[in-house]
Amino acid sequence: MARVKRGVQARRRHKKILTLAKGYYNARRKVFRVAKQAVIKAQQYAYIGRKQKKRNFRSLWITRINAAARINGLSYSRFMNGLLKAGITLDRKVLADIAVHDAAGFTALAEKAKGALAA
């Protein structure tokens, strides 16, 4: 059986990790063993960050909707309940965008929500 030397594969594997570690400081960029740990940790942070981004944006949208709803005399929960009863199905992202860029449109939505709550 032929002898297998793994120099090419090792070089390729090391190069892949060291390329991913570009922009890191000192040994985290130059030493394979340290760079590998740094890259793995960075990928973990990136994965977690992608999940947190969804939570953070939802929280931001709710805050913006709440602020605009209170200007129109409703709390966030009563506003959302009013929209549900009125049969208006807009997601929080769109509602927050309307609240920021179209105050008159949001006021109209708030009036419909108030009407649905009163009925």
Curated annotation (Swiss-Prot):
GO terms for molecular function: rRNA binding; structural constituent of ribosome. The keyword RNA-binding applies. PROSITE patterns: RIBOSOMAL_L20. Keywords: Ribonucleoprotein, Ribosomal protein, RNA-binding, rRNA-binding. InterPro entries: Ribosomal_bL20, RIBOSOMAL_L20_CS, Ribosomal_protein_bL20_C. GO terms for cellular component: ribonucleoprotein complex; ribosome. It comes from the Bacteria. GO terms for biological process: ribosomal large subunit assembly; translation. Binds directly to 23S ribosomal RNA and is necessary for the in vitro assembly process of the 50S ribosomal subunit. It is not involved in the protein synthesizing functions of that subunit. Belongs to the bacterial ribosomal protein bL20 family. This is Large ribosomal subunit protein bL20. It comes from Xanthomonas oryzae pv. oryzae (strain PXO99A). The lineage of its organism: Bacteria, Pseudomonadati, Pseudomonadota, Gammaproteobacteria, Lysobacterales.
